[in-house]
């Protein structure tokens, strides 16, 4: 028994716009180039960029011409990034769809231009509820669908939505399941769902007889799902670092939901969860995967190849090959990893971002990635030689202390500029020159963002009209828009009088989704939709 669905007519909050205004909003969306948002932060590089936004410009994003269009209400907190599908063939005609999931184990498709409910589905089986918060306030009061889904949409198809849902039987048993939903109907596909289970050779936490066992009660799927080469990859975080737990990555064949590969990155140790403030695993064009592992055991005894002899990679920047199954092929570990692990100043609170190939002053091309965590340092690694573990850090570049307050978020990238939102700090804009970061930010916002900082998204029309968007975790939540070059504020949702653009309470790790002239932002009760006012 999979998702149970029903269709519905228009459902909007009291702040929804009038029917005529909805029609006016719909018209431009159908007349411009249509862009899907199918995965966390727009693409597998996780750069947060929609470079084909032709409607929103530096000139029209202001409180006089831009604002809230409608809100949609769901049955739980929205922790995952909303996704967007254009021109889906539904029972009521061709529609642009906004895909939203909740911590109450529900998935929704709304008309992305009007807010009308197209379908709603539940992941719960008879006798089940969403998981309780496991005594941990990180995701509370219930745990259902936490991570951002991923959508597979081959040409001329409606698309398949892959998501992970956590639930609990009245008997007390916990389940994690992978679902595949028809984007047009919400109906289950590929004989789904499948219960998620795994084992891996090792003697670490929750092992028996030389095998580590995945216990679904001990984990939550925080990391956005990754789809490459017909495989959906999942990565697992713990509940408040409550042992026993280890670092799991799993792959499932997208077309069958059969498990095809499993890797544990702390199999003979403990901890090493994958958080990333909800960031998805990152992948390059050769299907290598990159991520930042959290505090956990690192085996500093290295083998002849320079890798931990026991295969334990706590608090590391990791590269995995997917050819023939998951395997660690490169890594970077801080020289002071033991101290960072003990003081909980690990890398795991941030996500990894892949940069486009860059040319240095000598004409050499570099394939780079960036990452940062709780220690306030900004790390740039060479993806073809990340640095390993040494008595001093030997990665490509380190900006020590560049991110005061630490990172519990994901950066964004556009046109040789890198944008980070540290805790309690402004959004900082760093510039690359000759394949190196300049040592100090070239711009920053006036606004500082309280915990967990900000994860920016960027819209642009090619190299023009670039706008940095960010959501503020406050009550009410605030959507901000900044000129991407200067970080001068263009708009925020508190500017209009009478609370015109307020859209609900904020939530941590929220990421604005920009598609076809609209901006969608999650809250504790639903999603606010913004665009040009009628």
Language model features by range: what are they?
Residues 15-27:
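Bacterial N-terminal signal peptides
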Residues 29-33:
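Sec/Tat signal peptide C-region and signal peptidase I cleavage site
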Residues 390-403, 441-446:
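Inter-blade linker and blade-boundary elements of WD-repeat/beta-propeller domains
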Residues 494-498:
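Contiguous ligand/interfacial binding patches
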């Amino acid at each position: 028994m999979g998702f149970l669905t029903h269709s519905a007519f228009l459902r909007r909050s009291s702040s929804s716009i009038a029917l005529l205004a909805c029609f006016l909003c719909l018209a431009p969306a159908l007349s411009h180039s249509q862009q899907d948002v199918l995965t966390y932060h727009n693409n597998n590089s996780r750069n947060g960029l929609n470079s084909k936004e032709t409607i929103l410009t530096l000139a029209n994003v202001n409180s006089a011409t831009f604002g809230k269009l409608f809100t949609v209400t769901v049955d739980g907190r929205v922790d995952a990034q909303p996704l967007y599908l254009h021109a889906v063939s539904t029972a009521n005609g061709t529609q642009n769809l906004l895909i939203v999931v909740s911590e109450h184990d529900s998935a929704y498709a709304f008309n992305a231009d009007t807010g009308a409910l197209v379908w709603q589905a539940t992941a719960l089986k008879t006798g089940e509820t969403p998981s309780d918060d496991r005594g941990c306030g990180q995701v509370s009061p219930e745990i259902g669908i936490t991570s951002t889904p991923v959508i597979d949409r081959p040409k001329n198809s409606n698309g398949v939505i892959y998501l992970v849902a956590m639930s609990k039987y009245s008997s007390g048993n916990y389940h994690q399941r992978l679902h595949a939903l028809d984007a047009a109907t919400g109906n289950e596909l590929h004989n789904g769902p499948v219960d998620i289970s795994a084992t891996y050779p090792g003697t670490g936490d929750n092992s028996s007889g030389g095998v580590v066992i995945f216990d679904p009660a001990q984990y939550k799927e925080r990391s956005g799902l990754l789809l490459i080469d017909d495989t959906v990859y999942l990565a697992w975080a713990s509940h408040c670092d409550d042992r026993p737990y280890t670092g799991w990555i799993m792959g499932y064949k997208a077309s069958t939901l059969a498990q095809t590969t499993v890797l544990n990155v702390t199999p003979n140790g403990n901890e090493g969860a994958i958080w990333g403030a909800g960031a998805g695993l990152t992948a390059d064009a050769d299907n290598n995967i990159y991520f930042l592992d959290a505090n956990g055991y690192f085996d500093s005894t290295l083998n002849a190849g320079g890798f931990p002899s026991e295969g334990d990679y706590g608090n590391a920047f990791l590269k995995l090959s997917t050819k023939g199954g998951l395997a660690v092929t490169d890594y970077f570990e801080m020289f002071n990893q033991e101290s960072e692990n003990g003081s909980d100043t690990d890398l795991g609170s941030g996500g990894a971002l892949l940069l486009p190939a860059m040319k240095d002053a000598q004409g050499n091309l570099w394939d780079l990635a960036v990452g940062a965590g709780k220690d306030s340092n900004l790390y740039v690694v060479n993806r073809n030689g990340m640095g390993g573990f040494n008595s001093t850090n030997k990665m490509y570049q380190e900006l020590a202390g560049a991110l005061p307050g630490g990172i519990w978020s994901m950066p964004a990238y556009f046109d040789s500029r890198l944008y980070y939102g540290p805790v309690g700090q402004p959004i900082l804009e760093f510039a690359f020159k000759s394949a190196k970061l300049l040592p100090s930010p070239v711009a920053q916002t006036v606004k500082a963002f309280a915990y967990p900082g900000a994860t920016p998204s960027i819209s642009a029309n090619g190299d023009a009209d670039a706008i940095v968007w960010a959501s503020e975790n406050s009550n009410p939540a605030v959507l901000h828009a900044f000129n991407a070059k200067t970080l001068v504020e263009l708009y925020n949702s508190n500017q209009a009088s009478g609370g015109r653009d307020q859209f609900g309470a904020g939530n941590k790790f929220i990421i604005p989704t920009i598609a076809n002239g609209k901006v969608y932002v999650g809250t504790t009760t639903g999603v606010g939709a913004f665009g040009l006012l009628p």
